[in-house]
């Protein structure tokens, strides 16, 4: 922001000038002290608090270290990691739909290992960001994260990714997620609901989510998803389980073309299908959507694609 911006004139220079003038009127010999105080205030405001807009800290060109603030185990192999930003008012500055890269030097690996993750927090939550990570036996970064203690640091770079969600970019979004593939979907769902007309926004996008997992306990972030669906009639969830409990009313087995046809928007120029999950599942969903008449997914998705794979 320019030092001569309207925001700084009204929020920094004007109060400082009033302090000096007011002091001159009351007691002239105090003016030098008032000038010094005003100068200090101006310098502080311009360097730290001169803008009401939060500072974006992500750098797409270089890794930065962020301190682990909290670890919250939500199952035997799934943890939410909260990393602190440099200042309480800072935000990541991550566009909706994009992700960040985590890097670490891991013993036995010839070079630094880098993996992508989507935060489950959003930029309206300042001072930190949250990552939901499932530790896989062969997952170098996910296993590395489990070794971190509060106070340790993690190297982060971003934003990256071809998806940048903007309000009303399409009429209806269909989502198919498996396991931790729910994280980019949640980011978009929360942004849409936060920007509904009832909340002062203008986003009227309809959203239908098919969320596939093996067991009931594998359904990540279920409470948050259920809360969002309960408060917003434009968002609907259909769960699919490989091993359903007795009395289960959702889908059973793998996500099928029939499930997609019944639950997600039909092919049209103003809809999108978003896919995220284990590679075998995403591959199967690409074939299924193509068989139903959706535009064939590209090997590397672009923003304009009808079927987009994270």
Swiss-Prot record:
Gene3D superfamilies in the cross-refs: Nucleotide-binding domain of ferredoxin-NADP reductase (FNR) module, Translation factors
Topology versus the membrane: Single-pass membrane protein
Where does the source fall among the domains of life? Answer: Eukaryota
> What pathway or pathways are given for this protein in its record?
Protein modification; peptidyl-diphthamide biosynthesis
Please state every residue range assigned to the domain named FAD-binding FR-type: 61-166
Matching entries from SUPFAM superfamilies are given as: Ferredoxin reductase-like, C-terminal NADP-linked domain, Riboflavin synthase domain-like
Q: Which cofactor does it need?
A: FAD
Q: What is its EC number?
A: 1.6.2.2
**Any one of the GO CC terms:** mitochondrial outer membrane
Q: Which UniProt keywords apply?
A: FAD, Flavoprotein, Membrane, Mitochondrion, Mitochondrion outer membrane, NAD, Oxidoreductase, Transferase, Transmembrane, Transmembrane helix
Write out the residues that bind FAD.
146-160, 172-209
Specify whether Metal-binding is a keyword of the entry: no
* Gene Ontology molecular-function annotations: cytochrome-b5 reductase activity, acting on NAD(P)H; NADH dehydrogenase activity; transferase activity
- On whether Oxidoreductase is a keyword of this UniProt record, the answer is yes
Q: What is its main location?
A: mitochondrion
Cellular compartment(s): Mitochondrion outer membrane
**One GO term (biological process):** protein histidyl modification to diphthamide
Recorded catalytic reaction(s): these are: 2 Fe(III)-[cytochrome b5] + NADH = 2 Fe(II)-[cytochrome b5] + NAD(+) + H(+); 2 Fe(3+)-[Dph3] + NADH = 2 Fe(2+)-[Dph3] + NAD(+) + H(+)
Ranges annotated as spanning the membrane: 30-50
Q: What InterPro entries does this protein map onto?
A: CBR-like, Cbr1-like_FAD-bd_dom, FAD-bd_FR_type, Flavoprot_Pyr_Nucl_cyt_Rdtase, FNR_nucleotide-bd, OxRdtase_FAD/NAD-bd, Riboflavin_synthase-like_b-brl
Membership in a protein family: Belongs to the flavoprotein pyridine nucleotide cytochrome reductase family.
Full protein name: NADH-cytochrome b5 reductase 1
Q: What's the name of its gene?
A: cbr1
């Amino acid at each position: 922001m320019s030092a001569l911006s309207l925001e700084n004139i009204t929020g920094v220079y004007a109060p400082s000038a009033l302090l000096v003038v007011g002091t001159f009127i009351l007691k002239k010999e105090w003016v030098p002290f008032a000038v010094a105080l005003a100068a200090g205030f101006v310098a502080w405001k311009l360097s730290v608090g001169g803008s009401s807009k939060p500072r974006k800290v992500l750098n797409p060109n270089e890794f930065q270290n962020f301190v682990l603030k909290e670890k919250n185990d939500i199952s035997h192999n799934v943890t939410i990691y909260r990393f602190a930003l440099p200042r309480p008012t800072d935000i990541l500055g991550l566009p909706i739909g994009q992700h960040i890269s985590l890097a670490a030097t891991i013993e036995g690996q010839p070079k630094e290992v880098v993996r992508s993750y989507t935060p489950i927090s959003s930029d309206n939550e300042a001072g930190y960001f949250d990552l939901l990570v499932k530790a896989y036996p062969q997952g170098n970064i996910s296993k590395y994260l489990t070794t971190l203690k509060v106070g340790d640091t993690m190297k982060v770079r971003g934003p990256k990714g071809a998806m940048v969600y903007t309000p009303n970019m399409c009429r209806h979004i269909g989502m198919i997620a498996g396991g931790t593939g729910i994280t980019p979907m949640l980011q978009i769902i929360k942004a849409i609901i936060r920007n509904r007309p009832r909340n002062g926004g203008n986003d009227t996008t309809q959203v239908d989510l098919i969320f596939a997992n093996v067991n009931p306990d594998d359904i990540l972030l279920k409470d948050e998803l259920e809360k969002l669906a309960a408060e917003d009639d434009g968002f609907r969830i259909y769960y699919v389980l490989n091993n359903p409990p007795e009395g289960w009313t959702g889908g059973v087995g793998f996500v099928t073309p029939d499930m997609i046809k019944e639950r997600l928007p039909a092919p049209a120029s103003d809809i999108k299908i978003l896919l995220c999950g284990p590679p075998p599942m995403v591959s199967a969903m690409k074939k299924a959507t193509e068989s139903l008449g959706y535009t064939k997914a590209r090997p590397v998705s672009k923003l304009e694609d009808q079927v987009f794979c994270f």
